[in-house]
Amino acid sequence: METFTNDRLQLPRNMIENSMFEEEPDVVDLAKEPCLHPLEPDEVEYEPRGSRLLVRGLGEHEMDEDEEDYESSAKLLGMSFMNRSSGLRNSATGYRQSPDGTCSVPSARTLVICVFVIVVAVSVIMVIYLLPRCTFTKEGCHKTNQSAELIQPIATNGKVFPWAQIRLPTAIIPQRYELSLHPNLTSMTFRGSVTISLQALQDTRDIILHSTGHNISSVTFMSAVSSQEKQVEILEYPYHEQIAVVAPESLLTGHNYTLKIEYSANISNSYYGFYGITYTDKSNEKKNFAATQFEPLAARSAFPCFDEPAFKATFIIKITRDEHHTALSNMPKKSSVPTEEGLIQDEFSESVKMSTYLVAFIVGEMRNLSQDVNGTLVSVYAVPEKIDQVYHALDTTVKLLEFYQNYFEIQYPLKKLDLVAIPDFEAGAMENWGLLTFREETLLYDNATSSVADRKLVTKIIAHELAHQWFGNLVTMQWWNDLWLNEGFATFMEYFSVEKIFKELNSYEDFLDARFKTMRKDSLNSSHPISSSVQSSEQIEEMFDSLSYFKGASLLLMLKSYLSEDVFQHAIILYLHNHSYAAIQSDDLWDSFNEVTGKTLDVKKMMKTWTLQKGFPLVTVQRKGTELLLQQERFFPSMQPEIQDSDTSHLWHIPISYVTDGRNYSEYRSVSLLDKKSDVINLTEQVQWVKVNTNMTGYYIVHYAHDGWAALINQLKRNPYVLSDKDRANLINNIFELAGLGKVPLQMAFDLIDYLRNETHTAPITEALFQTDLIYNLLEKLGHMDLSSRLVTRVHKLLQNQIQQQTWTDEGTPSMRELRSALLEFACAHSLENCTTMATKLFDGWMASNGTQSLPTDVMTTVFKVGARTEKGWLFLFSMYSSMGSEAEKDKILEALASSADAHKLYWLMKSSLDGDIIRTQKLSLIIRTVGRQFPGHLLAWDFVKENWNKLVHKFHLGSYTIQSIVAGSTHLFSTKTHLSEVQEFFENQSEATLQLRCVQEAFEVIELNIQWMARNLKTLTLWL
């Protein structure tokens, strides 16, 4: 293992000379504050801005930045003339001015040519200018109010490609694939053959399908009426990742055909498609492994196919492997046959009808533990040395599978269900039908090092992926615009099932926290409806965000709470039965609900107000005698009138639930539907207070006008437990969000949380810590150290009793243990009580034992963070990182390492993860987010992202969740106009596709909101905090 030394690494000067060092109002000049910033510019050598860090899989011969930009533009435009870019560039660079500076006199012939060129150029410009609002895009030129007026694409051989759209035509559909693969894990290449059975739905001559990165050696075609194979021409159009097979005869409606393609390709070195992994086992031996990740658009890189979710078909898969390897695919193994080369060919049974993105196969050394569940063999796989960490996953899967089969009243349709821990995997997990793939830390559980939070994570992710076997696999969205039908349902069922089966885990606390954070994102103007039109690969990747997952789940929770659990269950059972093995749209779901509710409620009309518009409502409530006056408007985090005026038409159908002091809370809850801008609810008696949005089951924020907030604050101080812990957390969230936009004074928010001295539940305390930590971070990053210290002191006084009651053990219920973890992390982060002393004592004992002494798992991260503050502690943690067999423990060490105040170490961590040798690249997003939360790491994280942007988008697809996370994690704490300008300027100099990414627009907006928040509240904080 490579060791770390500070003198090994020189930080680039531009990472020191950050714009944060420029003086501006309310900003500390950090260059003059060595105690706040551990590096002086003169201590480091200059590293040229153009220097490159090699990324695993990119190799040494990388394009320079200009060439990368040029090639990116070529791909974006999709025009054949861009293929000549290098030639154009070479000829241009051949021009040099005469040494003597003189100009030669042009000949008459040259003048004539020049005049001709000018006339042609002027003519072209006039034609373009006179075109009626023509916009050139990846698809071509779209005129206003017209569709499909596209530039005819040119195939790689110079011929016209017969299809110009990103979406495939529907004249031909696949019915069955026979796929044979022979991967070589030494050379990281593979040979493949795919035979596709086709049916013509319309007369056509061309077969358009997806393929990318394949060296196609043979294409043959055969009709059902003729058993003779014919070699056919193939055209390739890489910009849409499509190929066209020109059939030797017209394909007739209703007739069947067979297409066979033989090809070879590289095993990918990214995290997409059929990709390779190299890892080191416990004996320090290098091992090769190959796995797949096809969602959303990568099946086409493993085999030519109709790579859209609506094109469902069956699959027969054969894989040739070494004898010591195991091969897995979606279906049970049918046979294993030795080959002449001394290898083994495994054939798997024909699959059920499914989408291409759900196809999966894995080759490598694995062991498994299995259990039969009503005829389905459930197996959990891991690399051999980690097989002892699969017991929890197997037990959890068995319980969840039985629950889902009973709840949905549909049996799991396959004979086997495999769950595999992949040594290097970007996504958290993937729901491939019958072959679920996971990161090791989201499937494996080590009793000695995994905390209660780790246990909840593994349990929830298994629940999520199992729910997909029905929502997504059995019933699939037609196109990626309705991704929320897959992810929203799986996320909802994740929390619902865990709450039913593992009630002691209190998963509702996590769901509540997820809803709070999702609403912060959804309130932004850069948000989007969860059902949104998408076309390009970047737009599709961007749909995999917290809105598709958690807003989708939140809307289903709201609907279940409004209709009742019985009606909700009946409707989804009907939905699954009616659309099994089909591809559907949102309307199909709402039609199932309407069928169950009859004429009592138009669910489709109600829910479209939530799925087809972005954002959510702010409901203002006013008590007036025995009346509740209600008014709805869109919630905006900004008070800027120009933004609010543009969205005055928003209207939601809002389930209004409420409790009051006039009734017993556990017995009384009233619900009505607010489907207009304002309405009145008549109460049976006059009340002192009202709490709207009971248990925060509705997806909206509530403002209590006039004395409404004061009445609730008084009640919390008298007796907070008349409200549930969900409602108390909901009030804390709502009042801080409203204070942020100026609806209520910030001091009122702090008055509300004064009751926390008497709070014993996790959800309200963790929400208060989250809200106050946001304020602390903004103050700290601007250098307001005295003010941020006074804020910590105030919060500490509220929670002092709870902190002093904590023990450094793993005792108590899961909720109590998570509260202990949160409180002690807060106390140690700010050196409160004797927290640092206790953590240091535990760390020193652990270090003295060479890492063999057990630590309480729930406080392990806090102990490691305190230990990492010293040079000796940091280096010891780093030395232990690679030798640890538990991914849960490694993640805790990595978070501690990335929390250092030493910029050299932080930069080295990010660089090492990008390289992928010592720290896997899958961890880079976690490292950047952690560094970005620190002071002064937030400056370093952004500079690192800027310096390595091209490498990042090569490794992680543009628009992917990882890129979204990296952009947000490196910019979300900026709150100055200087930094806003810097971030804007950087992305404006990237491609148009990059600039238009929602995560980029969100970054601009978040910084602007941070600036507004500080302008609105800094003076107030200074006066009374």
From Swiss-Prot:
Note accompanying the cofactor annotation: Binds 1 zinc ion per subunit.
Protein's UniProt keywords contain Phosphoprotein:
yes
Hey, what tissues is this thing expressed in?
Answer: Highly expressed in heart, brain, spleen, lung, kidney and white adipose tissue. Detected at lower levels in skeletal muscle and liver.
* Cofactor(s) in the UniProt record: Zn(2+)
Return the annotated region ranges for Tankyrase binding: 96-101
Q: Which domain of life is it from?
A: Eukaryota
Chief location:
membrane
GO cellular component term of the entry, any: cytoplasm
Where's the motif Dileucine internalization motif? Answer: 53-54, 76-77
User: Where does the record place the modification Phosphotyrosine?
Assistant: Y70
Q: How is it modified after translation?
A: N-glycosylated.
Q: Which residues bind Zn(2+)?
A: H464, H468, E487
What the entry lists under CDD domains is as follows: M1_APN-Q_like
Protein name stated in the entry: Leucyl-cystinyl aminopeptidase
